[in-house]
């Protein structure tokens, strides 16, 4: 298009947090975003600035439910095709050390339950990073929301979520990289993705038991990767979530894995993943521990 604008029409997955390196490479999700949408996207880069604007439909939505003691009761039953979806993202990188940006998502209900109810969702994010040197970077993101009263279901309709990350490369420590992360999410925050779960499709997460109330969930996470040579890589992760809710135990998850790069196009990976939700959680929430062993073959074309 004119003025060097990149324009896209169709279906795509948008992930601004991933673009800025705001979650660990083996993790599946950002706090918010990273979902399919159908529509129009325009992107413009000029100098050290980048801007993206989106108009779309059919974006992912979440239907909050509350536990009535016997079953989960949906708040509204809204669907993804009941919302118009508008997004604006701007970021600025003046030099190799510092970057800053902001994102806004506006979900406006215009059909069905989303139109008939007060169910709009406005989500705003501010993110930044500072590299002390090429191997150490401090970065993070802060979200705040305004959600419709009907969708909030009687709980806080202006929730917050944020995380801070210290990213240390293996070039500094020699034997491993380190990803140290602290995250805090209000329990009424709308649209939280599963946090710190492995990037392999359907997976369990320490935030799966997050309740809907006016408290906040705190998540600590440590990730480490060891690149031994061109063939062998190992990694490990530990994450723990405190839901700040009486009767709900903390969730703890740890993972170890090894990857063998057989050829430039073929890799084999073996992973052990363990999660413990505690033993005394209320009916309707996960309890006990579980684990899996996963063998994965990746072929690149």
Predicted region positions:
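Outer-membrane beta-barrel "beta-signal"
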Residues: 260-266, 287-301
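Secondary-structure boundary/capping motif
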Residues: 11, 52, 104-106, 137, ...
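C-terminal structured domain segments
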Residues: 251-274
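Sequence/structural signature of outer-membrane beta-barrel proteins
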Residues: 12-29, 56-80, 105-115, 143-154, ...
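Residues that define the transmembrane beta-barrel architecture of outer-membrane proteins
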Residues: 34-38, 45, 82-86, 120-124, ...
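Detector for outer-membrane/organellar transmembrane beta-barrel domains
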Residues: 92-110, 117-244
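Outer membrane beta-barrel
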Residues: 1-69, 80-99, 129, 139, ...
